[in-house]
UniProtKB/Swiss-Prot annotation:
Residues annotated as catalytic: 95 (electrophile), 163 (proton acceptor)
Species of the source: Orientia tsutsugamushi (strain Boryong) (Rickettsia tsutsugamushi)
Complexes and interactors: Homodimer.
Lineage of source species: Bacteria, Pseudomonadati, Pseudomonadota, Alphaproteobacteria, Rickettsiales
Gene that this polypeptide is encoded by: tpiA
EC top class, as a word: isomerase
Protein name: Triosephosphate isomerase
Cross-referenced PANTHER family: TRIOSEPHOSPHATE ISOMERASE
Length: 249
């Protein structure tokens, strides 16, 4: 199974900076298997970057509309159908920043996941507990509740990103045992919904303060790859992470 690196740029880079960054990565193409890397860039850049870099890279939207219609009077919204028209094959859904800052709830996230699936876009669904749930030992129940709202997607091609909210951007990383415990539970819950005659195509990645310094250890936690934020904005750390992940295959 190919290991995955999702590079989430968030609201960083001008368009020219984005092009320069990807050009630098292109210069390393002989040493990096780019097919395993998904760049989640600002939605505004998707069309231009895909035009400039053609099929060199996989690109992901950082969000997608919850509106089921492909078009309509919805100011500011970008439908899954619009993304698919650009040949965008991935979209991040339910990132903790959107849950917190934009009050996205389980129904909103489920709608976005369903819209992605209906348009042959692979949703990268972010789940994870706040520090309160970790401290009071209810984190497994918290995560299970998040998963219950998207259980309809478990027979589809999706990526689940486990990102403890308290770990994102904090330099605090769960222990390997902690990550493995959650990953194991996720797989157990998935298996309840997947018939025996259907192959499990769900991949699980870890996100939350992933860096070049801890990637080797994180990869021992039974995951299929990583979702990285800040560390993916610097070429040296990103290439180190990619090379390390490649070593698994």
């Amino acid at each position: 199974m190919e290991s995955i690196v999702v590079s989430n740029w968030k609201m960083h880079f001008s368009f020219s900076e984005a092009c320069n960054y990807l050009n630098l990565i292109t210069s390393l193409h002989g040493n990096l298997n780019i097919a395993k890397v998904i760049f989640a860039v600002p939605n505004l850049y998707l069309s231009g970057l895909k035009l400039k870099f053609n099929d060199t890279y996989h690109f992901s939207a950082q969000d997608v509309s919850m509106i089921t219609e492909s078009s309509g009077p919805y100011t500011g919204e970008i439908s899954a159908s619009m993304l698919k028209n650009l040949n965008v094959n991935y979209a991040i859904v339910g990132h903790s920043e959107r849950r917190l800052l934009f009050y996205e709830d389980a129904n909103t996230i489920a709608s976005k996941v369903r819209n992605c699936i209906n348009n042959a876009i692979v949703p990268i669904v972010c789940i994870g507990e706040p520090i309160e749930a970790r401290k009071n030992k209810t984190y497994l129940q918290y995560i299970a509740q998040q998963l219950s709202s998207i259980s309809f997607s478990f027979t589809k091609n999706i990526i689940i990103a486990y990102e403890p909210v308290w770990s994102i951007g904090s330099c605090m990383v769960p222990t390997i045992d902690d990550i493995y415990e959650v990953v194991t539970m996720i797989r157990e819950i998935q298996n309840r919904y997947i018939p025996h005659n259907i192959e499990n195509s769900v991949k699980i990645v870890y996100g939350g303060s992933v860096s070049a310094n801890n990637i080797n250890q994180i990869l021992t936690a039974g995951i299929d790859g990583v979702l990285i934020g800040k560390a993916s904005l610097k070429l040296e750390s990103l290439t180190t992470i990619i090379k390390t992940v490649q070593g698994l295959d």
